[in-house]
Amino acid sequence: MLLASALVLGAYLLGSVSTAILVCRLAGLPDPRSQGSGNPGATNVLRTGRKGAAIITLLGDLLKGLVPVLVAHALGLEPVWIAAVALAAFLGHLFPVYHGFRGGKGVATALGVILGIQAWVGLAALATWLIVAAISRISSLSALTAATLTPVYMYLLTGERWYVAAGVLLAALIYWRHRANIRRLLRGEEPKIGNKTKNKSEV
């Protein structure tokens, strides 16, 4: 119990590390919170025109979700604790203690924790994102579609209630963090992937 609780706390603290802010500082780029959508995420870093920085941000956000969950599996924790570790890492990204509890929208970190919980579920969610992105070129729509289907994939591929519950909570939080994007989608005003914009629209 103590070890599991410590891992949950560690997952939150790791999730709170903002890869986007770190990468932009090291690369001499503007703070992602002060440009584009204002969101510290890979899509907003991409809007600076630095694809390499965006890729590093994406990988960093994914890994900080993936690693704690893999550690939880390696330690033989029960599904309820693995789900708790996954949610803690995700919540750290959304509400980082190091940045005034104002974080990103969590799509890459969510993918990381899902891959950690069950690799096939993560790959199914990633495939969903890629297919929708290829058709629409809208990052938020791709993320929302993948989030919607993740609990379904989790149920079909694991049958574990705690993992399904984690998938539902992840999806709900992603929807909540994308509420402005949803309004723009309904108005047909959401920008496409790769567009440089000053609008507050980021995944």
UniProtKB/Swiss-Prot annotation:
Transmembrane parts of this sequence: 3-23, 75-95, 113-133, 156-176
Main enzyme class: transferase
GO molecular function: acyl-phosphate glycerol-3-phosphate acyltransferase activity
InterPro entries: G3P_acylTferase_PlsY
GO process annotations (BP): phospholipid biosynthetic process
Membrane topology, as annotated: Multi-pass membrane protein
Pathway field: Lipid metabolism; phospholipid metabolism
EC number: 2.3.1.275
One of the record's GO cellular component terms: plasma membrane
Subcellular location: Cell inner membrane
Keyword set, alphabetical order: Cell inner membrane, Cell membrane, Lipid biosynthesis, Lipid metabolism, Membrane, Phospholipid biosynthesis, Phospholipid metabolism, Transferase, Transmembrane, Transmembrane helix
Catalysed transformations (reactions): an acyl phosphate + sn-glycerol 3-phosphate = a 1-acyl-sn-glycero-3-phosphate + phosphate
Assembly and binders: Probably interacts with PlsX.
Function: Catalyzes the transfer of an acyl group from acyl-phosphate (acyl-PO(4)) to glycerol-3-phosphate (G3P) to form lysophosphatidic acid (LPA). This enzyme utilizes acyl-phosphate as fatty acyl donor, but not acyl-CoA or acyl-ACP.
NCBIfam families: glycerol-3-phosphate 1-O-acyltransferase PlsY
Family: Belongs to the PlsY family.
Protein name: Glycerol-3-phosphate acyltransferase
Species of provenance: Thioalkalivibrio sulfidiphilus (strain HL-EbGR7)
Taxonomic path: Bacteria, Pseudomonadati, Pseudomonadota, Gammaproteobacteria, Chromatiales
Gene responsible for this protein: plsY
